[in-house]
């Protein structure tokens, strides 16, 4: 479709097919600053019984909602590998009241949690003192607002634990060992 210089262009696509690759052709030539393709991931059933990172963006996990993204985007914690710096993680401005900061993630696929890793790499003076995790298995299409409201009553996946600066914290799932989950709430 024809476009104009120095502007954003949005195109609605009605194709329901599943794609793994997109090719952008520009005619006759020129430059494109950014391309963003929005859509929903189709979960690959090849995982089967294989142990995978249920909260990896590469496997299809996504952030649903959070209460604060003052210094870093919540979606950053889903990225693969080790963070480059603090800006490459999720950082809040810290709640000073009795409430805590939280983030809700939709898992790549429903699964049973074996182990949990909370990484505070690069966070030396501003790591969360404690954290807890809640989880649930929710069926059907549910709005983000409804998920946030329901999350207040989710079961504990990890009881409140002390965290430390610049460290990978590893935990075994003892509270919901044989329960299937597809949403996780991080409380810090």
Can you say where each PLM-predicted feature lies in the sequence?
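Trp- and acidic/polar-enriched beta-sheet ligand-binding modules for extracellular glycan
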Residues: 1-102, 112, 122-188
């Amino acid at each position: 479709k024809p476009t104009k210089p120095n502007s954003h262009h949005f195109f609605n696509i009605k194709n329901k097919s599943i794609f793994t690759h997109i090719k952008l052709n520009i005619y006759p030539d020129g430059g494109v600053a950014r391309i963003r393709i929005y859509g929903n991931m189709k979960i690959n059933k090849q995982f089967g019984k294989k142990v995978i990172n249920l909260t990896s963006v590469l496997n299809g996990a996504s952030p649903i909602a959070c209460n604060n993204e003052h210094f870093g985007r919540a979606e950053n914690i889903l990225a693969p590998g080790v963070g480059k710096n603090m800006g490459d993680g999720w950082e809040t401005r810290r709640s000073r009241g009795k409430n805590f900061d939280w983030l809700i993630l939709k898992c790549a696929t429903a699964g049973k949690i074996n182990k949990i890793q909370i990484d505070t790499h690069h966070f030396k003076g501003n790591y969360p003192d404690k954290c807890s995790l809640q989880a649930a298995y929710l069926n059907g299409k549910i709005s983000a607002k409804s998920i946030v409201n329901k999350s207040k009553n989710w079961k504990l996946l990890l009881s409140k634990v002390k965290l430390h600066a610049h460290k990978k914290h590893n935990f075994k799932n003892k509270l919901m060992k044989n329960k299937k989950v597809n949403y996780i709430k991080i409380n810090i």
